Swiss-Prot record:
Protein name: Proteasome subunit alpha type-2-A
Gene coding for it: PAB1
NCBIfam families: PRK03996.1 (NF003075)
Predominant location: cytoplasm
UniProt subunit comment: Component of the 20S core complex of the 26S proteasome. The 26S proteasome is composed of a core protease (CP), known as the 20S proteasome, capped at one or both ends by the 19S regulatory particle (RP/PA700). The 20S proteasome core is composed of 28 subunits that are arranged in four stacked rings, resulting in a barrel-shaped structure. The two end rings are each formed by seven alpha subunits, and the two central rings are each formed by seven beta subunits. The catalytic chamber with the active sites is on the inside of the barrel.
Subcellular location: Cytoplasm; Nucleus
């Protein structure tokens, strides 16, 4: 019979042991724009393509990299509306933790809370899985951290990772270039070079976004002028 008769059932396993709706959610991630993250010795960088649906869209209104807390940022591949829902839920969790314990939420705990929300949407009736994967970058008492969270709710800590439509080329490139003693500026250069692998058209500060966090524990998104400077350095 195959898996097709189970493709509309969220809570029923197919004979091959898959939840087919999660497979479809991963397909949505795989067709999204390429995003990547690199953990350096002194910080973390996340970067993504930012292709606009039309030249008439105001590029300033499209922000793929977001703050979750002052020291945690996130980027996605997949469906933008789903990402915004998860950002809102994650920020609420972080605010509740801060209010209760009077200290910022650890990166690992916020990732776990977000992954729990995503997992609950794989086993509940009347909902569908989130069609996004997330890369979460943070810096806390345990140092720089990079996590990837997938639609199934699974999450892992990574030294460097990529997701989206160019994932295989990007991961191959990262495997060749990554070193554990890499510093933050080197990681930004590597992130740009990784995005250039398979990039359609000319890469510029208008069609990529980069976020970073260092030992100051302040996550920020680079300005177009800063991205232009880094692009000039890797030419």
């Amino acid at each position: 019979m195959g898996d097709s008769q189970y493709s509309f059932s969220l809570t029923t396993f197919s004979p091959s042991g898959k939840l087919v709706q999660i497979e479809h959610a991963l397909t949505a991630v795989g067709s999204g724009q390429t995003s990547l993250g690199i953990k350096a010795s002194n910080g973390v960088v996340i970067a993504t393509e930012k292709k606009l649906p039309s030249i008439l869209v105001d590029e300033a209104s499209v922000q793929k990299i977001q703050h979750l807390t002052p020291n945690i940022g996130v980027v996605y591949s997949g469906m933008g509306p789903d990402f915004r829902v998860l950002v809102r839920k994650s920020r609420k969790q972080a605010e509740q933790y801060l209010r209760l314990y009077k200290e910022p939420i650890p990166v690992t705990q916020l990732v776990r809370e977000t992954a729990t929300v995503m997992q609950e949407f794989t086993q509940s009736g009347g909902v569908r899985p989130f069609g996004v994967s997330l890369l979460v970058a943070g810096y806390d008492d345990k140092g720089p951290q990079l996590y990837q969270v997938d639609p199934s709710g699974s999450y892992f800590s990574w030294k460097a990772s990529a997701m989206g439509k160019n994932v295989s080329n990007a991961k191959t490139f990262l495997e060749k270039r990554y070193t554990e003693d890499m510093e933050l500026d080197d990681a930004i250069h590597t992130a740009i070079l990784t995005l250039k692998e398979g990039f359609e058209g000319e890469i510029s500060s208008k069609n990529i976004e980069i976020g970073k966090i260092g030992a100051d524990k302040v996550f920020r998104v680079l300005t177009p002028a800063e991205i232009d400077d880094y692009l000039a350095e890797v030419e």
